[in-house]
């Protein structure tokens, strides 16, 4: 079992004095197992889509970058697609964050938030699973992975006292727009061969509104 948020970062399961466990496992390792089981048991499988909403979408975006099952299953011909929806925070690949979120074209530079680059918001102090994947592989995989970012037009929430999240933008809506722009800043426009962002008209922080949209 995991705490309220450890699971969406791929952290190890818990082993406490109150609830002892014989071993610990990363939540991302469980996803690896599920991927392999699906492909091994369904020979005609053509596509796997992993989606999640809010806290779940934080797992989707990080597993899309650092998950290892896909790397060992490329020869199967299965198409892997990730669809995070209304995401509260993202994984950045360097120390730069948006300088002014109130402008139409975003620019990026250093931030005063000392925790901004700590995992799960950045690439410093990666947990065990992500560390085993490695920063170079994480960065390369994210660029080459099919990811569709969905965000509600009216998802204005997500404020927190955590500066590492707030320097990504004031709300979930603006964070998604900023991050999508950041991808082009970091990788160049070729990243958009695999990455898309769609703002869902009329939707707020509501999964049903997102998935029932056209």
Residue ranges of each PLM-predicted region?
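C-terminal catalytic histidine-bearing segment of alpha/beta-hydrolase fold enzymes
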Residues: 150, 180-214
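Alpha/beta-hydrolase fold nucleophile elbow
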Residues: 43-54
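Catalytic nucleophile serine of serine hydrolases
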Residues: 54-55, 86
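The feature captures the conserved acid-bearing segment of alpha/beta-hydrolase catalytic domains
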Residues: 76-185, 189
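Alpha/beta-hydrolase active-site loop
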Residues: 2-42
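Active-site rim elements
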Residues: 17-23, 165-171, 203-204, 208
């Amino acid at each position: 079992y995991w705490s309220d948020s450890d699971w969406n970062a791929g952290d190890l399961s818990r082993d406490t004095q109150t609830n002892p466990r014989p071993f610990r496992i990363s939540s991302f390792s469980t996803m690896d197992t599920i991927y392999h089981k699906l492909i091994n048991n369904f020979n005609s499988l053509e596509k796997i889509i992993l989606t999640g909403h809010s806290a779940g979408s934080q797992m989707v975006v990080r597993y899309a970058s650092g998950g290892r099952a896909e790397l060992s299953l490329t020869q199967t011909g299965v198409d892997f697609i990730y669809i995070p929806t209304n995401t509260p925070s993202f994984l950045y690949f360097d120390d730069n964050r948006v300088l002014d979120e109130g402008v139409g074209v975003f620019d990026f530079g250093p931030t005063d938030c000392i925790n901004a680059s700590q995992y799960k918001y950045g690439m410093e102090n990666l947990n065990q699973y992500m560390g085993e994947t490695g920063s170079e592989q994480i960065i390369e995989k994210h660029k080459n992975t099919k990811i569709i970012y969905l965000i509600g037009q009216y998802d204005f929430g997500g404020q927190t006292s955590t500066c590492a999240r707030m320097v990504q933008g004031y709300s979930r809506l603006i964070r998604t727009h900023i991050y999508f722009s950041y991808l082009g800043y970091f990788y160049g426009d070729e990243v958009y061969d695999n990455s898309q962002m769609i703002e869902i008209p009329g939707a707020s922080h509501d999964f049903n509104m997102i998935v029932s949209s056209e």
